[in-house]
């Protein structure tokens, strides 16, 4: 097959470095990169651009697309590093963390066969709120989307090429498909619900890949292969102005958005995709500043290993940062962890990815086919890696077969069973004719406190649910208000599952009104929004005179034993402590409520007594 005219572009490796570093910062919960998850969007646009460019050049050269060869190349590029990673993580979790092993078991097959995103969707597994420790393979959702694109897109291109589709028609088709995908994301997104469905979906993420594909048609990198002449001044400034502006826009999106921002799903990811496309268009031009800046050796070095960095960073971070750790991790410790991630990715690149890419598997197959002499020689020459691979495989298989599921994970079934999973809360029981003494509306953190809360506050009510957002609190409260059962004390234990804004919190508090005693329980969760949410809750207590803070964050500090493996949900001991904390915080208001109830009951009994005495006197007079 004639070789394509595709060229290596170092600056695109630099852009890969930006993308993978953004993702790592996001998973490190860096407060200044809450939108680091957009690094995946950068990868999508890059993949769409490069893969489509290769397929276009192959069609131009051969008037066909060798699908088998294309898919084999993709498999050679992706699968060996994945298999090596899986073996290593299985070994590490078998030896050191059985909870993570339990979590990753059901994800291994979906990850190997690139359908993990749909596995998470149909299993209702959230990307943003993992009950228990997250699976070390959660991040494979993006690889699944890319591989699904690699499977389908060449077929579509080949069919359109054979139908003699013009370049203009190609571009129109791609734009329509991308628009449908972006519209699906906007329409399916529900601000009050977990956004994982639109975050994981191939249908709702395809537009990023398609924008890259569109760019490959209108701005192919091959057209700049021979360009060395200096650009006119105006063209130079226009080109670089666009690239720098797009870069600033992308950085702002990383810095000021997060996984729960409605803007992100209603145009933000689309905007990030367009910014990435502009940056690619500028970076592939050899005379641009981005081309030179992103071609810096450190960035290129990181970019070449970005695939390995992406594979390794998430499981290693989970292993090195237990989510139930409530202490502070020093910057030096984070640097050490980053160095370990880089070392693993570099090892994978040097000894797994590159050798396979350069025919190591083919050489091994040739050795086997050569017979009994060549194979022993081959194995003897590679005795250390063969022994290591065998040992890893034995330990990994042993862990899968013999390590039982952890009890911590099993306890989560109880959370789901106790959680209110209905869209609206159930109606109050028929015997409730007066207001509840206290009403608590919470998320999954307070689910385990339900039996203790009901025992502590027999005249109260608790409504807690998994994946509940703060913005849903208004609807839940109004339901109880309309039922006429809201007393004077209302507790909100929300803010675990996503960012909380001053506006949303004020709307909730204003809905309740100034005539209630409101308590806000702050949060402890190993997520990027923890610090900001707690600050937002603290500010609300200063703006509203009837609002009091219940400081769970401080009470739980340095008490790793309070939490299940996810560092968020409570153990049985902690559920009792959590309930006692609420009891202590609300004691004065509860005393007033109970005193008033006692007085009302005494008055009622006195009224009954007076009425009864009057009836008796009336009967005696009649006699």
Predicted regions: what they are:
Residues 300, 510, 538-539:
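Surface-exposed alpha-helical segments enriched in charged/polar residues
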Residues 508-535:
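Active-site segments of SGNH/GDSL-like serine hydrolases
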Residues 231, 257, 324-331, 342, ...:
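Extracellular/periplasmic envelope-modification machinery, especially enzymes
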Residues 44, 69, 113, 439-441, ...:
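Structural recognition of the beta-strand scaffold that forms the well-ordered cores
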């Amino acid at each position: 097959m004639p070789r394509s005219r595709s060229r290596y572009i170092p600056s695109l490796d630099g852009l890969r470095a930006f993308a993978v570093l953004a993702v790592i910062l996001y998973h490190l919960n860096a407060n200044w990169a809450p939108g680091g998850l957009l690094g995946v969007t950068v990868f999508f646009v890059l993949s769409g651009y490069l893969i489509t460019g290769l397929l276009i050049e192959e069609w131009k050269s051969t008037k066909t697309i060798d699908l088998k060869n294309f898919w084999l190349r993709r498999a050679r590029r992706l699968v060996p590093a994945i298999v090596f990673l899986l073996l290593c993580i299985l070994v590490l979790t078998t030896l050191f963390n059985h909870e993570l092993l339990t979590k990753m078991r059901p994800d291994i097959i979906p990850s190997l066969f690139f359908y993990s995103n749909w596995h998470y969707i149909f299993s209702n597994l959230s990307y943003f709120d993992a009950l228990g420790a997250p699976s070390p393979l959660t991040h494979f959702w993006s690889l699944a989307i890319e591989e699904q694109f690699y499977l389908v897109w060449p077929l579509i291109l080949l069919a359109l090429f054979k139908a003699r589709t013009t370049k203009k028609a190609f571009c129109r088709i791609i734009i329509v498909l991308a628009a449908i995908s972006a519209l699906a994301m906007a329409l399916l997104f529900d601000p009050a619900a977990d956004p994982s469905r639109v975050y994981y979906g191939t249908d709702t993420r395809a537009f990023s890949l398609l924008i890259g594909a569109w760019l490959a048609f209108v701005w192919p990198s091959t057209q700049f292969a021979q360009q060395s002449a200096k650009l006119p001044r105006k063209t130079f400034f226009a080109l670089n102005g666009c690239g720098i502006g797009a870069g600033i826009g992308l950085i702002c999106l990383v810095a000021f958005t997060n996984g729960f921002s409605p803007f992100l799903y209603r145009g933000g990811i689309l905007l990030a995709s367009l910014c990435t496309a502009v940056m690619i268009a500028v970076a592939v031009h050899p005379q641009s500043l981005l081309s030179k800046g992103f071609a810096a050796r450190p960035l290129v070095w990181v970019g070449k290993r970005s695939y390995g960095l992406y594979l390794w960073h998430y499981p290693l971070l989970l292993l090195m940062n237990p989510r139930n750790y409530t202490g502070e991790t020093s910057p030096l410790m984070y640097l050490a962890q980053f160095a370990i991630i880089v070392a693993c990715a570099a090892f994978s690149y040097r000894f797994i990815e590159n050798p396979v890419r350069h025919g190591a598997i083919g050489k091994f197959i040739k050795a086997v086919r050569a017979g009994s002499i060549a194979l022993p020689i081959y194995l003897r020459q590679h005795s250390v890696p063969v022994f290591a691979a065998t040992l890893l495989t034995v330990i990994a298989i042993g862990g899968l077969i013999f390590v039982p599921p952890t009890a911590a994970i099993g306890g989560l079934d109880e959370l789901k069973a106790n959680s209110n999973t209905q869209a609206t809360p159930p109606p109050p029981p028929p015997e409730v004719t007066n207001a509840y003494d206290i009403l608590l509306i919470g998320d999954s953190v307070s689910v385990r406190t339900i039996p203790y809360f009901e025992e502590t506050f027999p005249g109260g009510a608790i409504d807690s649910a998994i994946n509940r957002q703060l913005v849903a609190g208004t609807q839940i409260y109004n339901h109880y208000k309309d039922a006429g059962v809201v007393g004077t004390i209302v507790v909100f234990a929300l803010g675990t599952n996503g960012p909380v804004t001053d506006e949303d919190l004020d709307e909730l508090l204003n809905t309740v009104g100034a005539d209630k005693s409101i308590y806000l329980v702050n949060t402890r969760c190993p997520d990027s929004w923890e610090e900001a949410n707690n600050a937002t809750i603290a500010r609300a207590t200063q703006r509203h005179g009837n609002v009091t803070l219940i400081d769970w964050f401080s009470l739980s500090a340095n008490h790793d034993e309070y939490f299940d493996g996810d560092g968020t949900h409570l153990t049985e001991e902690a559920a009792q402590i959590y309930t006692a904390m609420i009891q202590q915080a609300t004691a004065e208001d509860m005393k007033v409520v109970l005193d008033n109830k006692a007085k009302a009951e005494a008055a009622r009994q006195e009224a009954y007594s007076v009425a009864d005495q009057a009836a008796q006197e009336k009967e005696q007079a009649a006699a």
